[in-house]
Amino acid sequence: PDKLNFVLYARGQVLALDPGITRYGVPLHSGWYKTTLAHNTLVVDEANQKPAEGKCLAFGDEGGVEFVVAEAGDIYDGVRFVRSIALLDENVVVVIDQVRCGGERLLDVALHLRGQWVNLPDGSRWTPPNKDGYRYLREATVRRLEREAVIQVRPKEGWQIATALLTDAPADLITALGIGNHAEDLVPMLMVRRRASALTLVWGIGLDGQPIALSWRPVRAEPPDAMVAAVEVRLPNGKVCTFVANPDRAMAQVTLPDGTVWQTKAIFGVRR
């Protein structure tokens, strides 16, 4: 139940991890390791994904940016989930998640990052539901994510990573400690939660600890109901890159920072 889960490896260490498995018969086997929440992906209505056949929509290299776009398939009834991942350089990874539902659903997108929290923003205590995956979360807190935030984790002494988040509408940002290789191997988890029929979420992971500035760019699409998102990524060195995630291959018109209009039908477009 882990369609579109991803693993991030850098500097000799797994950062965004896959939980793996434990011994059969141990409650953690089905209660945590085999749950969707234990992976870096989408959970709907606090239930595990159904078995499904996902597919790769596109991959390649454009403007020096390596990217891949994949669709999860029929993981939940009436839900479409597309994830685009772009590698800008050895220190910057951008993930764009696009979710569409036939009606209002409870949407959770989780990211598990090894390390320790650094200056975690204040939040209120959050009591996880007594359901597989969720019941094993510890020290859970919640705060409102109006549009954007930056969360930092220290994988080891002398190394921090910064994760910037950008949502298309307010959501809850839940932080907690999940499980790694065993019950006492605690791993920080970020989870963006919204009850809605749609969600577009961007993760910008700075492996050198420098926050990445994320913002939306105005975009028009034909047809108007196509799944399209345009995001501006501003790197710590001042360089700017604009991405379009366009899995429907709609005619997308993006207004760039200089006022010019960029037209593209690419599944994933890049402007630097």
Identify what each model region corresponds to.
Residues 1-33:
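Internal mixed beta-strand/loop scaffold within catalytic domains of large alpha/beta enzymes
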Residues 22-272:
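CBM-like, beta-strand-rich accessory domains located in the C-terminal region of large
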